[in-house]
Amino acid sequence: MYIYSMAREQTLSALQLVYSSTELQKLGFSYYQISNLVEQNKLVRLNKSHYENVEFVGDMNDFYYIPAFVPEGVICLMSAAVYYNLTTFRPDSIDVAVPLKKKLSSFPQSVNISLHYFSKERLSLGVCDVKVQKNSFKIFDIEKTVVDIISNRNKVGIEETKEILTNYLARQDRDINKLYRYAEKLSCLKILKTYLEVLL
């Protein structure tokens, strides 16, 4: 009875949008109590292992849903470029990099996700863990994002690629050497140099 009472006193943080079943259990919620929170419309079940906190009051960002639906996913390409303010383009879905041959069983109805299959090396380079209040997601760092876009310039669009690289080069914190290192590892150093010769 004492353990049950202690668990009932646990509350959800209004600053965390998505909870995993494991997180809820660590907070002291039983499966029965989690079901009650769903019935009370305090939680919405997203999939077998994650729930959305209806009482979330933080700044909304659809990136917070990605770990629930694509645990190994990394925000990439145009979605990452938007995050770093490198483009005025607004994609209608979130670009997420995943391992080759990765299969996913469920997607959210409210969030559009575009999967991009990356090799093991490309997926492991330049990954950042971003934490905002009690929410987190993975995204490639800004230089890796630029190099990935150059590699995928035909898919992204030549004008969009030029805009993104131009905006990156205008930043005071730009790191050309880091661009070169990524480009060399990902076999697009020649095309990067061609762009830089024109833009610098």
What is each stretch, according to the model?
Residues 2-4, 71:
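Conserved functional hotspots at enzyme active or ligand-binding sites that engage polyanionic ligands
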Residues 4-19:
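Short amphipathic alpha-helical interface segments
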Residues 16-23, 38, 52-200:
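Nucleic-acid-binding surface
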Residues 26-39:
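Short amphipathic alpha-helical interaction segments
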Residues 42-48:
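A short, conserved structural fragment
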